[in-house]
A protein has these predicted regions:
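N-terminal export signals
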Residues: 5-25
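Short, compositionally biased P/S/T/A/G/V-rich stretches that sit at domain boundaries
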Residues: 27-52
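Aromatic/hydrophobic beta-strand junction motif of beta-rich domains
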Residues: 58-64
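Surface-exposed, short loops/turns at beta-strand junctions within beta-sandwich domains
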Residues: 88-94
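Active-site beta->alpha N-cap acidic-glycine motif
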Residues: 112-193, 241, 344
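Metal-dependent polysaccharide deacetylase catalytic core of the NodB/CE4 family, i.e.
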Residues: 165-253, 276-282, 342-344, 348-352
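Active-site-adjacent pocket scaffolds in enzyme catalytic domains
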Residues: 176-180, 239-240, 244, 249-346
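C-terminal domain-boundary segment and adjacent tail
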Residues: 269-274, 346-392
Length: 392
């Protein structure tokens, strides 16, 4: 795409990663201008700048030809050789930042967009993946109350103790023939009465195959999503339904149509590991390397084209021994880039004694994680509400 076309697309918010990037630091010296910080799509809160009247002042850093005059959003930047810095005040939810270099090579510019989490506060969310066993258990045993099932009782106790909120990401079926249409709707009043802290959401059609949507067409993902969502609404009601924040295995086709289909269904946030495995970024919704690397050490990143914000999962309780739960969370809370939103995850199957990899102290791990963030002043939220659980 030619530079002018790229910048026009950027101005319309259509670019998925960066606005108008050109090469800097070529053999003859710096020949273009580049904004290094903030990152395009970055989410800024009070930890990333200075509160000023009506806004948040953040620092813009980058590189440009040493002899060029540089301005950022029309304000002259400070220069130090090839480097430049400038202060920009964020006053709207989204702000375009444009750096312009005027020099012997002509006029060059680079542009990014950032999101201001204006009403941010320290918060955590707790999601549980791979849910199906508890629904099968309730359906087959016909309990008088949902909370006669030990799994939901355990979550209810954590809510009573800490005010915790949970979203349970649900499969349509299990491998022994149970399917969501078999779950009765007679518990709808109880689901409704507990929807302020307990929600159900789409995860996948089934546990197997692994990575079911990594290469699946958008039609397959959409159909499975709608199938699960319809059943949740039927037996638990609209109040209990939540648009998903975790697709099974956190991998989808990296196509605009996929994210557009999810956004159309109310998806506002997607959580992943954004970690390197065998030399490749994984559990990252197949985002490009630059964004995956950024998300590996930041809370969140906005994809402006779809409107979806990606969130970094900070801990997976079933993979961390009880004695290491707090040690795992401590550095997350110390880093201003990861400390504002704590994204906690675990998986349902490890609670059940019949499961081959049953974890006897799984519930204690949840208690330890929730107790720690609660004692540190974090509030429970649903990630799909507002902006990552905070008011817009």
């Amino acid at each position: 795409m030619r530079r002018r076309a790229l910048l026009q697309a950027a101005a319309a918010g259509a670019a998925g990663m960066v606005f108008g990037r050109t090469a800097a630091g070529s053999p003859g010296g710096v020949q273009a201008i580049r904004i290094d910080e903030p990152f395009h799509g970055a989410v800024h809160n009070r930890r990333h700048g200075k509160a000023v009247e009506g806004g948040l002042e953040v620092t813009v850093r980058g590189e440009a030809p040493p002899t060029a005059g540089v301005s950022v959003n029309g304000i002259p930047a400070r220069r130090d050789g090839a480097r430049f810095t400038a202060a920009v005040v964020l006053r709207q939810q989204e702000t375009d930042i444009t750096a312009v270099a005027d020099g012997a090579a002509g006029r060059r510019e680079d542009r990014i967009r950032v999101r201001w989490d204006r009403h941010s506060f320290p918060r955590y969310r707790f999601a549980i993946d791979d849910n199906s066993f508890f629904l099968r258990d309730i359906a087959r045993k016909g309990y008088k109350s949902l909370f006669d099932c030990f799994y939901l009782k355990m979550l209810s106790d954590l809510h009573a103790k800490y005010g915790a909120k949970f979203v349970l990401n649900v499969y349509y079926r299990t491998d022994d023939g149970f399917e969501l249409p078999q779950f009765p709707d007679r518990y709808r009043p109880e689901w409704r009465d507990n929807a302020h802290w307990l929600r159900l959401s789409f995860h996948a059609l089934a546990d197997k195959p692994d990575r079911p949507y990594q290469d699946a067409p958008v039609e397959k993902l959409s159909a499975d999503f709608d199938k699960v969502a319809a059943e949740i609404r039927r037996f638990a009601g609209e109040e209990t339904y939540a648009p998903t924040t975790v697709i099974h295995w956190g991998m989808v086709r990296p196509e605009p149509a996929v994210f557009a289909a999810l956004a159309k269904r109310g998806v506002r946030a997607l959580s992943g590991y954004f970690e390197m495995r065998d030399g490749r970024w994984d559990i990252n919704y197949r985002l490009d390397d630059r964004r995956s690397e950024y998300l590996s050490h930041h809370d969140a990143l906005v994809d402006f084209a779809s409107g979806i914000t990606f969130s970094k999962i900070d801990i997976v309780c079933n993979t961390v021994p009880l004695a290491r739960i707090v040690h795992t969370l401590e550095p997350v809370l110390r880093d201003p880039n990861t400390a504002e939103i704590i994204d906690i995850l675990t998986h349902e199957q490890y609670f059940w004694p019949f499961y081959v990899n049953y974890i006897p102290d799984h519930a204690q791990r949840l208690d330890a994680a929730i107790r720690y963030v609660t004692e540190k002043g974090y509030k429970p939220v649903f990630l799909h509400e507002g902006f990552l659980g905070a008011p817009e």
